[in-house]
């Protein structure tokens, strides 16, 4: 056989038929070999990308210490996760945001400052250390297999690299809490698989782009805490979770926001500048679980359509400008557990520390952003109180009225109810006593009557507050009626992570903390730990006090306890049994002031309650000596035993062990002897009030070592010797009406002469004027609001020639008179040019905008033209008043329709825009004893307010003419004004300080009903709430002494002014009556009242005929009340709520 060529043999071999499985295996092997090679190359590339990333960023905390070239297993590096092919699929590096080089103002720990932020996206901050910084490296885009990019709470800055928007496989983009700037792109080239985008708390600006709706798989979007502006787009309802809080979003919400919201579960639009109505279409979002719209300026009513939200668990619409009745349909939200319709606590109170004023949009006002409030009509439908899953019902200070809800269903889940500071009437229903899981019940400052139910689980409640009502009967012995087990005391730890799958737990802890530290007695924040607060104050409770209503489970060294029952009619012996179990608590605060308690302070109080921090038993009838054992209460911070009948000497033990004592007042008692030298050891003391006793001896020289002392009141005693020199500057200082001698030392040149008057042996008080009178420091009558101060005998002594004496009294008087005339002339010249420069011309300029904004309908239209016409172009013939803010004119708009027009002095105001913002708040205020603000006009050349017209004139005229001596009429006037001020102070958000309470600002109708006018106008002048930056801060004679010393005003300054008005109403004297001249310089009606009371001559104070006609005891009680309102110590002055309560207790019977 002939052999074949070798080449042919080879071909034939390869041409032989091979089995198909062998062919497939060979092909697969070849493909795998090629793929493995490629994967190896890609994996090596991922490692190099990570190393380049590390090289690019700043890492002062060595977070990336494990990322080293020598390590082959880069998939085990910190923050790196890989798939089965060793491709990097996740980069998850959470920083603390608190490294030393970090410029980031929002750290992971700062989440605790915004407890309601981030449902569905909240994270645990524990275990995070350090922070990466620098620009976000664009090399990260080379990780083409990356599905999760999570770098929250670092300090990355600059714009987000453009390439990130094109990463096709990325599912999670989390850059929360960095410093990223720039805006979101108009178009996204990738991100088709993105499910989560979290850019919260960066500095991203611009508008929300429509291109976001192209990311069809996006479910969770968090853009909160940025600088996004523009409006909320309609497509945002397509996401499952949407967070846009704390941005610059403005305008109305789109009406169609709920048209495509089938997946929406969480929607947070809080802390923006949204206006207009809440869209009804949100009622179509059937899967919605939480809806947070708080802290905007949304208007009108809550949509009825919300009743369709069967899965809704949390609804918070607080701090808006909503109105109207609460919809009954909310009772259909069967899953609702948290309902917040108003809220006095600012959830974003720490916004300044994170964002600052500079981060607000142009023209925005942070104050107005946090001061809006809702004012509803009617009451709470019982369909809401019967909701089966309701845990929190929070509607304080929302102008709700009517009968208190009686049907609370089974209330098995109910834990918090806050309906305080409304206008509910009636009794506390039996149904509430069945709510055994209640841990907070606040019904304070309503108009509730009847007796307290002993079945209410008060001993188990962390907060129980019924203060400021008209409840009567005894305070029950709740302990004998508590059978159920108490839930644990909740304390909010702002740095811990809560279960954010249950938003109600966040609200529970947040409100618990706020309610505890927001008590009127003390801020417990410095002590920390849980607290229990039980408030029965300012009611009509009688009887004796039992043991503190605190369950056994509540006792423990971690718990602080506050008990307040002041302002009632409690009687009996000093309640020593109240301090049982006191030593089983961390700290105890007790207020039983303004009652009728008698007897002695128990000698063993120090052994009963070593944890006592505050004891206020002022304004009672306690007698006997002060126990020496009180000095052993080393934890005591404040002790107030003023206005009692204590006798004997002040024990020296009070100053030896009480190192923590900051406040001590034992004024207005019958104490004798000397001031203990041991008081010089009270180095923490801030306030010392020993006034109006019978103390003798000298002022201890060691007082000059009390560097923290700001208030020293020793007036109205029998002290002798010199006034020690070397005192620190006092906010309040008074040693008048003693027997002191020697020179008057200057306390940094600011000792008022009136504070040392009534000491016949003191050298004459040399006077200088603290301020030069100007147009801004004059009241409506032209009285200059200046004060006389003692000058230093050295610094202010006139130069004397050798051998010559000083100026004689006649020369001094002549110089003083000449100086006064010159000052007045200068003031008149300044006033002339000021008015020439700023005040509008008498005729209305043609360019004035003619819009009049109305807050209510009075049946006839009020226009700019008919106001000008009705006032005769503001003619003097229609002038009915002239004050510091402008002139007031009577205007008959049409037949039987008369209004009062207050034409404002434009030169005083900061601008029309601010005026519009401020007047909006005043226009909402409604109270039976406030002059009603009907409308206003404001332009660059003209401003006026429209008020209801009151034909009875003002109280100043009433007192001068002494129109009546009927005690019932006088009492009603006093009560009317007290109610108006209490409303401004305690039921307005923000609270309104009047700053100029005086008879001419109190108007009367024909039936002698009283109305307070000019409220809120001081704020319109552009002054802050606590600092008076212009002269409009009161009228001389009515100004509180602390304002003269510190230029600070508060609600207690209004209380002082009210007390002066009340004294005028009771007497026939003015605040600075000419008849007081004989008593010396600076003597006023307050000092006159104190003098007569101290001398037992109260009868002489009252106007002729009033004493004979009125009940003597009640008249003296009201006189005492007026004097307490005018004491120098702010903490001793009552609140206006307490004044109202006391006047109601002294109300004379009607005919």
Swiss-Prot record:
The modification Phosphothreonine is found at residues 863, 871, 1046. One of its GO terms (molecular function) is ATP binding. GO terms for biological process: anther development; embryonic meristem development; lignin metabolic process; longitudinal axis specification; meristem maintenance; pollen germination; pollen maturation; radial axis specification. It is an enzyme of class 2 (transferase). Its main location: membrane. InterPro entries: Kinase-like_dom_sf, Leu-rich_rpt, Leu-rich_rpt_typical-subtyp, LRR_dom_sf, LRR_N_plant-typ, Plant_LRR-RLKs, Prot_kinase_dom, Protein_kinase_ATP_BS. Residues 772-802 are annotated as: Disordered. It catalyses: L-seryl-[protein] + ATP = O-phospho-L-seryl-[protein] + ADP + H(+); L-threonyl-[protein] + ATP = O-phospho-L-threonyl-[protein] + ADP + H(+). The keyword ATP-binding applies. Residues 36-811 are extracellular. Residues 1-35 form the signal peptide. ATP binds at residues 880-888, 902. This is LRR receptor-like serine/threonine-protein kinase RPK2. The gene is RPK2.
């Amino acid at each position: 056989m002939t052999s074949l060529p070798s080449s042919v043999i080879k071909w034939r071999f390869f041409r032989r038929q091979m089995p198909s499985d062998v062919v497939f295996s060979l092909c697969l092997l070849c493909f795998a070999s090629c793929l493995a090679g490629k994967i190896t190359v890609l994996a090596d590339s991922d490692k190099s990308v990570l190393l380049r990333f590390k090289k690019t960023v700043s890492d002062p905390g060595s977070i990336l210490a494990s990322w080293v070239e020598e390590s082959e297993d880069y998939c085990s590096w910190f923050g790196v996760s890989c798939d089965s092919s060793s491709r990097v699929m996740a980069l998850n590096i959470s920083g603390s945001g608190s490294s030393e080089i970090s410029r980031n103002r929002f750290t992971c720990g700062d989440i605790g400052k915004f407890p309601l932020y981030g449902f569905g996206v909240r994270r645990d901050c524990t275990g995070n250390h350090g922070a990466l910084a620098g620009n976000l490296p664009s090399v990260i885009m080379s990780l083409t297999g990356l599905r999760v990019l999570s770098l929250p709470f670092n300090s990355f800055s600059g714009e987000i690299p453009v390439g990130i928007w094109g990463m096709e496989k990325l599912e999670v983009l989390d850059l929360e809490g960095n410093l990223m700037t720039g805006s979101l792109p108009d178009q996204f080239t990738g991100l088709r698989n993105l499910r989560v985008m979290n850019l919260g708390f960066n500095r991203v600006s611009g508008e929300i782009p429509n291109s976001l709706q192209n990311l069809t798989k996006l479910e969770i979007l968090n853009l909160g805490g940025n600088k996004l502006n523009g409006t909320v787009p309609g497509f945002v309802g397509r996401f499952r979770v949407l967070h846009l809080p704390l941005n610059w979003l403005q305008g109305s919400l789109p009406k169609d926001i709920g048209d495509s919201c089938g997946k929406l579960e969480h929607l947070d639009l809080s802390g923006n500048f949204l206006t207009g109505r809440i869209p009804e279409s949100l009622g179509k979002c059937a899967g919605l679980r939480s809806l947070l719209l708080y802290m905007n300026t949304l208007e009108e009513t809550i949509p009825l359509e919300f009743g369709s939200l069967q899965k809704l668990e949390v609804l918070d619409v607080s701090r808006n400008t909503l109105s109207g009745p609460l919809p009954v349909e909310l009772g259909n939200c069967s899953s609702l557990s948290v309902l917040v319709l108003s809220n006095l606590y600012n959830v974003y109170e720490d916004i300044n520390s994170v964002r600052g004023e500079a981060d607000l949009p142009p023209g925005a006002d942070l104050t107005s952003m946090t001061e809006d409030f809702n004012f509803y009509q009617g009451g709470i439908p019982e369909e809401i109180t019967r909701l089966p899953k309701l845990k929190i019902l929070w509607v304080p200070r929302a102008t709700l009225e009517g009968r208190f809800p009686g049907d609370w269903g089974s209330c098995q889940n109910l834990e918090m109810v806050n309906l305080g500071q409304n206008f509910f009437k009636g009794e506390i229903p039996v149904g509430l006593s069945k709510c055994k899981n209640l841990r907070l019940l606040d019904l304070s400052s309503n108009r509730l009557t009847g007796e307290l139910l002993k079945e209410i689980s008060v001993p188990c409640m962390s907060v129980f507050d019924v203060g400021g009502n008209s409840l009567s009967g005894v305070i029950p012995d709740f302990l004998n009626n508590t059978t159920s087990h108490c839930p644990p005391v909740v304390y909010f730890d702002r740095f811990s992570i809560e279960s954010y799958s249950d938003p109600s737990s966040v609200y529970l802890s947040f409100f618990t903390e706020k309610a505890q530290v927001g008590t009127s007695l003390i801020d417990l924040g410095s002590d920390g730990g849980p607290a229990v607060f039980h408030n029965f104050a300012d009611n009509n409770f009688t009887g004796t006090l039992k043991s503190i209503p605190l369950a056994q489970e509540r006792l423990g060294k971690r718990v602080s306890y506050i008990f307040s029952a002041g302002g009632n009619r409690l009687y009996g012996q000093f309640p020593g049994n109240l301090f049982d179990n006191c030593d089983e608590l961390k700290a105890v605060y007790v207020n039983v002031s303004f009652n009728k308690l008698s007897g002695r302070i128990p000698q063993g109080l120090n052994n009963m309650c070593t944890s006592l921090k505050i004891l206020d038993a002022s304004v009672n009838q306690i007698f006997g000596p002060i126990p020496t054992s009180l000095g052993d209460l080393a934890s005591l911070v404040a002790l107030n035993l003023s206005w009692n009948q204590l006798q004997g000497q002040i024990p020296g033990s009070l100053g030896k062990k009480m190192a923590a004592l900051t406040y001590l007042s034992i004024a207005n008692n019958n104490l004798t002897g000397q001031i203990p030298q041991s008081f010089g050891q009270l180095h923490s003391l801030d306030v010392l009030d020993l006034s109006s006793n019978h103390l003798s001896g000298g002022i201890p020289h060691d007082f000059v070592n009390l560097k923290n002392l700001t208030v020293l009141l020793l007036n109205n005693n029998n002290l002798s010797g010199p006034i020690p020199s070397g005192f620190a500057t006092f906010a309040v200082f008074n040693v008048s009406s003693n027997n002191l001698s020697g020179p008057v030392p200057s306390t940094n040149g600011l000792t008022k002469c009136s504070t040392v008057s009534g000491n016949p042996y003191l050298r004459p008080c040399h006077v200088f004027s603290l301020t030069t009178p100007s147009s801004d420091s004059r009241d409506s009558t032209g009285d200059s609001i200046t004060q006389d101060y003692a000058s230093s005998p050295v610094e202010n002594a006139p130069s004397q020639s050798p051998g010559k004496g000083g100026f004689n009294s006649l020369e001094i008087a002549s110089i003083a008179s000449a100086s006064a005339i010159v000052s007045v002339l200068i003031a008149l010249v300044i006033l002339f040019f000021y008015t020439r420069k700023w005040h509008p011309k008498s005729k209305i300029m043609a360019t004035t905008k003619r819009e009049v904004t109305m807050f209510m309908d009075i049946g006839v239209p009020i226009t700019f033209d008919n106001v000008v016409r009705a006032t005769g172009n503001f003619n003097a013939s229609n002038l009915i008043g002239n004050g510091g803010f402008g002139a007031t004119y009577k205007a008959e708009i049409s037949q039987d329709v008369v209004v009062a027009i207050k034409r404002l002095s434009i030169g005083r105001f900061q601008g029309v825009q601010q005026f519009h913002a401020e007047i909006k708040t005043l226009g909402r205020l409604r109270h039976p004893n406030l002059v009603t603000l009907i409308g206003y006009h404001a332009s660059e050349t003209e401003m006026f307010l429209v008020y209801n017209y009151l034909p009875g004139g003002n109280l100043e005229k009433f007192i001068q003419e002494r129109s009546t001596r009927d005690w019932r009429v006088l009492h009603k006037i006093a009560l009317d004004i007290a109610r108006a001020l209490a409303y401004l102070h305690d039921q307005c958000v923000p609270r309104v300080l009047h700053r100029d309470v005086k008879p001419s600002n109190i108007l009367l109708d024909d039936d002698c009903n009283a109305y307070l006018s000019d409220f809120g106008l001081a704020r319109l002048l552009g002054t802050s709430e606590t600092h008076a930056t212009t002269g409009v801060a009161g009228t001389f004679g009515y100004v509180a002494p602390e304002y003269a010393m510190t230029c600070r005003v508060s609600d207690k300054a209004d209380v002082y002014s009210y007390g002066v008005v009340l004294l005028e109403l009771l007497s026939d004297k003015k605040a600075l009556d000419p008849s007081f001249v004989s008593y010396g310089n600076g003597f006023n009606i307050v000092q006159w009242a104190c003098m007569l009371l101290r001398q037992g001559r109260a009868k002489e104070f009252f106007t002729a005929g009033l004493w004979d006609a009125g009940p003597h005891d009640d008249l003296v009680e009201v006189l005492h009340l007026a004097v307490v309102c005018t004491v120098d110590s702010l903490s001793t002055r009552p609140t206006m709520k307490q004044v109202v309560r006391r006047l109601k207790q002294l109300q004379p019977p009607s005919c």
